[in-house]
């Protein structure tokens, strides 16, 4: 609540915006978060603990629907008030996957992962569609994103000139790959 960007300040700004604008919209629609209930560190820790416990329940195969939904609600609640930190492509992908997985798991108290039960076809198709969306959008952005000065690092084959030292989760080998000749970068870009 008193961190770098306190989530309580964000929620209060949303609340005052709704009041000033005379909007007939719920604050829950603008920021769908159970952190509206309380903006204290204790409640934030409870929400995090709910997410952790429900993840363990999901791993154990216990009450999978409740576990997925409570994990999704916990993560969504934290993500919408932590946009500078949880606003990456994989955060949205994780939320979408959680939501679609709710329709994938069987309605049982305990799900044995070794069972041969087929998930519903619609659920499988929705997850395949999500995987296609990820791959398609990842490819489209390479050709439609223009940086400063109208340059496109993917079209110019220069994106890997800085990728290895600016990637979000760098590998120990990134330093060494960055030192390879630039022709390696260009060939790698052609094949991605």
Predicted regions and their residues:
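Alpha-helical membrane-anchoring segments
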Residues: 1-192
């Amino acid at each position: 609540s008193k961190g770098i960007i306190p989530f309580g300040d964000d929620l209060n700004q949303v609340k005052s915006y709704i009041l000033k604008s005379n909007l007939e919209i719920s604050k829950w629609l603008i920021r769908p978060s159970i952190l509206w209930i309380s903006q204290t560190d204790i409640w934030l820790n409870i929400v995090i603990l709910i997410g952790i416990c429900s993840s363990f329940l999901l791993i154990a195969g216990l009450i999978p629907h409740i576990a997925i939904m409570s994990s999704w609600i916990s993560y969504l609640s934290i993500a919408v008030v932590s946009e500078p930190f949880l606003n990456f492509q994989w955060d949205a992908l994780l939320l979408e996957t959680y939501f679609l997985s709710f329709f994938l798991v069987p309605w049982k108290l305990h799900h044995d992962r070794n069972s041969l039960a087929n998930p519903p076809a619609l659920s499988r198709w929705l997850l395949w569609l999500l995987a296609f969306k990820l791959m398609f959008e990842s490819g489209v952005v390479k050709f439609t994103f223009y940086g400063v000065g109208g340059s496109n690092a993917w079209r110019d084959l220069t994106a890997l000139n800085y990728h290895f030292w600016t990637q979000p989760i760098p590998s120990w080998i990134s330093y060494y790959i960055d030192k390879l000749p630039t022709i390696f970068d260009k060939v790698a870009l052609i094949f991605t």
